[in-house]
Amino acid sequence: GEALYSQVQRAVDQARGEGADYVIMVGHLGDNGITEKWSSRSVIANTTGIDAAIDGHSHEVCVENVPNESGEMVVLTQTGTKFANIGKLTITTDGQIQASHVSAVTDAEGNPAKDAEMESFINGIKSQYEESLKVVLGRTDVDLMDKDPETGLRAVRKAETNLGDLCADASRYMMGADIGFMNGGGIRAGIEAGDITYEDALSVFPYGNMICMAEVSGQKIKDALEMGVKNYPEESGGFIHVSGLTYTVDSSVPSSVVLDEKRNFVSVGGEYRVRDIYVGEEPLDVNRTYTLASHNYWLKSGGDGMSMLMGCPILKDETMVDVDTITSYISEYLGGTVGEEYKDPRGQGRITIK
């Protein structure tokens, strides 16, 4: 945290020194569901000279005044996600800074306004891919959920869902591994009951991660699970959906995960929140090795701070793109249809949270 604040302060001081009348910080830090010392509010609270902060990452819609290190108010704003709003930041002639959101762009009559040239350009791009995106790859008899079925709020970053189960199963089965891991942050959309098109699959996995299989110790498996729930009950992109494994989270135990300055896992400094970890019917043995299927983002790059997984022997290296694992699993192992096995939107009871 301190290194970040110092670097931001140096940049602000440099801008002021070069004659800037106003300093607007643009960041992708966020606030909810992340480590507090790296939040936009913490940066503001530990610096001076910033007039306004335009932030992102946590998909919040907000306009707030946040005190800086000297107690002066700084405008903090976010516009949500997926172009739900257009942000507007205005510096008035008397030096006041005002932030607002525009949720709909309309013409003089109040109708949705579209730029004809831009719409034509976008439609031209869409037409190039329309045919391939609409190819039917399988079917699901159930809604595959990334959200809580009751609240409609995103669930995959803090709870088991049937789609999370399916994605983890796809990796494990296609790699022939003991265990499958999939991060909640990598599951970007749900799939409604009906035909599954290539576009549907790409909506779930838009990043093109490659699936690998590694040899990983039981201790590293346990550490990864602990890392995945360090923020609970807040969201975490590193929340782990599992296949071939079950575990319980005791949320009454405070997280004691120790991170380095880059938010990578270092150790667990106290009691583990995860317990009752089973691989199949057997308790996890921290002293033996298992084969783990996941994507290169975790197994090779240590994404989401999963540094404990880096350096493990890679047994199958980037054999399939993540989208293909879903469709191949459905066709080869489920007979082309996702059915009763995945009917519960909250999954198959692989993750118990107390």
Regions found by a protein language model. Give the residues of each.
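Catalytic centers of hydrolytic enzymes
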Residues: 69, 80-354
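Functional cores that coordinate and move charged inorganic groups
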Residues: 1-124
